[in-house]
Amino acid sequence: MQIRRRPPNPAVEMGTLRYEVSVPESKPKNILEEIVWHKEKEVDYLRDKEPLVELRKKINLMPPPLDFLTTLSTGKTQLAVIAEVKKASPSKGVIRQDFEPVAIAKLYQENAATCISVLTDRKFFQGSFENLANIRENVDLPLLCKDFLIYPYQIYFARLYGADAVLLIAAILSDQDLKYFIKIVNSLGMTALVEVHTLKELDRVLGIEGVKLIGINNRNLEDFSVDLQTTFQLMEARKKELEKLGILVVSESGIHSYEDINFMINAGVNAVLVGESLVKKTNPGTALLQLFNENKS
């Protein structure tokens, strides 16, 4: 998958005037590209509002982040669980109308979640960094900032708001970007969850030094379709290499039932990331426990 970072806008100059010409290529090819183009504008705005040097000063005064990776490897359940606080998505719209992020996070913590993921993208997922900060103040579990990171600035911004880990999506980052971002994440004492969807992306990531945690996304970010076989196929192809390198693997998206959990155990992953199937239930905490209970009512 090739994602263009900015829309190509051919321009015609006439003297001191410059006219942008609309062409078919000026439109995003898929949802992921649309998100990335909007993220470019968002980061420009944030950097103007609060320069990186100011972020780093504030971060230096913060306590160190929690150890997301170690916590995942010592989960209390057969599979570690990253429970996600998520209000909406581009494919499903609003998932939960009475959305109270702190209350949901507390229910996760009370019901055996290993770590918590917080959607912070505002435009497409109706999340916010304020949600992340508020959850950080109210729960003790390590937090993953779930967003679309395309600049190092966003790593620092996530840390400032309480993130212990960040998501790095291989489909929107070059190898050079991934290497540099991972160095920054490590320098801040955080964890990088590097996300892949295809075998080609997985092989790219396996060749990058410093990767310790990989997420296999069962959701195709071009059209947001979901197939749990994605995890099974990638694990079947590269399980030995992953184990040899000591890399933990998280299966992300599309996990709704006890049967799905068993499927992932058999696939050989170390953890699952679950959001939508929990948030849409009346009690997300109870829903989390029921994922591991064959005799749920």
From Swiss-Prot:
EC assignment: 4.1.1.48
Record-level Gene Ontology MF annotations: indole-3-glycerol-phosphate synthase activity; phosphoribosylanthranilate isomerase activity
Keyword Lyase: yes
GO biological process: L-tryptophan biosynthetic process
Pathway the protein contributes to: Amino-acid biosynthesis; L-tryptophan biosynthesis; L-tryptophan from chorismate: step 4/5
Disulfide bonds: none
CDD domains per the UniProt record, alphabetical: IGPS (cd00331)
Chemical reaction(s) catalysed: 1-(2-carboxyphenylamino)-1-deoxy-D-ribulose 5-phosphate + H(+) = (1S,2R)-1-C-(indol-3-yl)glycerol 3-phosphate + CO2 + H2O
Keywords: Amino-acid biosynthesis, Aromatic amino acid biosynthesis, Decarboxylase, Lyase, Tryptophan biosynthesis
Family matches, as Pfam families: IGPS
InterPro entries reported in the protein's UniProt record: Aldolase_TIM, Indole-3-glycerol_P_synth, Indole-3-glycerol_P_synth_dom, Indole-3-GlycerolPSynthase_CS, RibuloseP-bd_barrel
NCBIfam families (alphabetical): PRK00278.1-4 (NF001372), PRK00278.2-4 (NF001377)
Family: Belongs to the TrpC family.
Protein's name in the database: Indole-3-glycerol phosphate synthase
Gene: trpC
